[in-house]
């Protein structure tokens, strides 16, 4: 898996804006007025909450973020705007003097939350027209829309936001709230957690039931995809015309799940905004969720942390391996959404043309597998005197290349059996083939939804020419 350049992402987040306030202090006695602790406040902190936390996650990834929502004409709104400016988030706040900015005040002592005080009026009764007008003006410049619903009223007219996004050709991702999912009809992707999903479709006892009920929900709501986040059980991606993708959780230690859903939808949106396929975006979001649940409190994930997670996910052994070993290695990589590329050849005398070709092949995916003809196979194909280099030498040379992940030998005249067993996402062959049907293994790859690519060889480089030059002195 390759980490995208999130700085190229531009995402519009719409939802319920909140200010999170914390008062920290010691509690060493009980009040004489009532049986409650007395907290001596020693410090305070303000943080961006609600839909703003999605925007904060996107900004932490390095993306460009526009945030749209309601706030009051009060001190809390001013504090929220200051925090958003510091985070590099472009805020488009519709000020409403008649309501208070949603504020959640938490009193914390010795890392324990003693009480939470909520200040809110809700926005459902407000005229949505000004907000919808601002939304439409922002749509043109954005790549992906995120609707973050906390059921406070900002998305009371969520249908209008979805319809406008679809007309503009913008993917719209929704983090839903409540049991009325019909409000989100026509969205590109919904990201409910398992509890939210089961509240709508009923309890699910296994993956098969999640898939069955999820597909029915997608059909009913005209969704392009559904991602159910399942805590310690990972997440499940469902699409109408593809098999279910069940990804295991990556978190080794779970300290706090606060805000994990915000992290998931922000990484999804950023990856899609830079053109990554949905399966890649989900794999990245799953990695990010595993990172963020290992942190205390509402947190975000940086590109550096994702890069470390991706690197740590690499198979422990690269290089020359057997087909059976390779098939075992590929299982978790497929679950993580990695794109597998396969090519094949004799590679008798490795030259710059080979190196360039293999680099081109690797660029088509996340992992490159090279299938190499055994010595007898080369002899039958090339004639007496070949190969010049025996199989172990050829495999060692290929395995030393940075572009190559694994090298597997085959003894037959063609690698069709190996290609069919691997089922790569991309089968690559070099040369002047007029039609991909002439390429061995093309049928297996196409039947499993893969693609076949033909790459040009670099002119002026040929193993045969090198051998002739050596023989001619």
UniProtKB/Swiss-Prot annotation:
Q: List the keywords (alphabetical).
A: ATP-binding, Carbohydrate metabolism, Kinase, Multifunctional enzyme, Nucleotide-binding, Nucleotidyltransferase, Transferase
Ranges for the region named Cytidylyltransferase are 342-473
Tell me the segments the record calls region Ribokinase: 1-316
The protein here is known as Bifunctional protein HldE
Cite the PROSITE patterns for this sequence: PFKB_KINASES_1
Query: Which NCBIfam families does the record associate with it?
Result: cyt_tran_rel, PRK11316.1, rfaE_dom_I, rfaE_dom_II
- Outline the subunit composition: Homodimer.
EC number in record: 2.7.1.167, 2.7.7.70
Q: Which residues bind ATP?
A: 193-196
Entry similarity comment: In the N-terminal section; belongs to the carbohydrate kinase PfkB family. In the C-terminal section; belongs to the cytidylyltransferase family.
The free-text function statement in the UniProt record for this protein reads: Catalyzes the ADP transfer from ATP to D-glycero-beta-D-manno-heptose 1-phosphate, yielding ADP-D-glycero-beta-D-manno-heptose.
Pathway annotation: Nucleotide-sugar biosynthesis; ADP-L-glycero-beta-D-manno-heptose biosynthesis; ADP-L-glycero-beta-D-manno-heptose from D-glycero-beta-D-manno-heptose 7-phosphate: step 1/4; Nucleotide-sugar biosynthesis; ADP-L-glycero-beta-D-manno-heptose biosynthesis; ADP-L-glycero-beta-D-manno-heptose from D-glycero-beta-D-manno-heptose 7-phosphate: step 3/4
MF terms from GO for this chain are:
ATP binding; heptose 7-phosphate kinase activity; heptose-1-phosphate adenylyltransferase activity; phosphotransferase activity, alcohol group as acceptor
What reaction is this protein's catalytic activity?
Answer: D-glycero-beta-D-manno-heptose 7-phosphate + ATP = D-glycero-beta-D-manno-heptose 1,7-bisphosphate + ADP + H(+); D-glycero-beta-D-manno-heptose 1-phosphate + ATP + H(+) = ADP-D-glycero-beta-D-manno-heptose + diphosphate
A cellular component annotation (GO) from this entry: cytosol
Q: Which GO terms describe its biological process?
A: ADP-L-glycero-beta-D-manno-heptose biosynthetic process
Organism classification, top ranks? Bacteria, Pseudomonadati, Pseudomonadota, Gammaproteobacteria, Methylococcales
Q: Which catalytic residues are annotated?
A: 262
Fetch the HAMAP family from UniProt. Answer: HldE
